[in-house]
């Protein structure tokens, strides 16, 4: 997807990391040596292209909230071709501390098995969505301390209103 976007003249910053499945070691190395903050400082938002399936737009994962507003805005932009949901640990858990981030399905199933399969027809559609997002999507970013740090459980709500 990234190479095709570059071939089509899109201007994008990208990170290729390793070891996401073993604790996000690659992205954490970038974070530890302060490279990550510098690299994504000018980025309006981040889309992690590493989610199994065909139609997930993750707004949270591994107990970390990424950005539900960005996830829903991207779903709307793609014509509801995706659905907002949650997942497990990913590099997005780290990236969301630096800019609004989501994790997007990229048309594969049965990851890391002998039965891993890619739906190339759907992958092309997703590539077209990503290029559309890069070239046409307008999003006004919110500082990360505003969107990701406050969560409310139903219990908090009841206590606040005296129930």
Regions found by a protein language model. Give the residues of each.
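Amphipathic, non-transmembrane alpha-helical secondary structure
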Residues: 3, 28-31, 93, 124, ...
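His/Asp/Glu-rich mid-to-C-terminal helical/loop segments that flank catalytic regions of hydrolases
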Residues: 6-7, 110-163
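Zn-dependent metallopeptidase/amidohydrolase metal-coordination segment
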Residues: 81-126
């Amino acid at each position: 997807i990234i190479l095709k976007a570059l071939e089509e003249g899109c201007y994008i910053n990208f990170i290729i990391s390793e070891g996401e499945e073993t604790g996000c070691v690659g992205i954490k190395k970038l974070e530890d040596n302060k490279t990550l903050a510098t690299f994504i400082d000018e980025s309006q938002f981040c889309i992690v292209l590493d989610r199994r399936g065909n139609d997930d737009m993750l707004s949270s994962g591994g107990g970390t909230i990424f950005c539900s507003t960005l996830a829903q805005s991207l779903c709307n932009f793609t014509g509801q071709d995706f659905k907002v949901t949650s997942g497990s640990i990913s590099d997005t858990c780290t990236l969301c501390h630096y800019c609004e981030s989501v994790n997007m399905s990229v048309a594969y199933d049965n990851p890391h098995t002998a039965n891993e399969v890619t739906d190339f027809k759907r992958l092309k559609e997703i590539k077209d969505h990503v290029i559309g997002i890069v070239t046409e999507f307008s999003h006004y970013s919110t500082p990360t301390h505003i969107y990701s740090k406050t969560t409310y459980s139903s219990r908090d709500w009841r206590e606040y209103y005296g129930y």
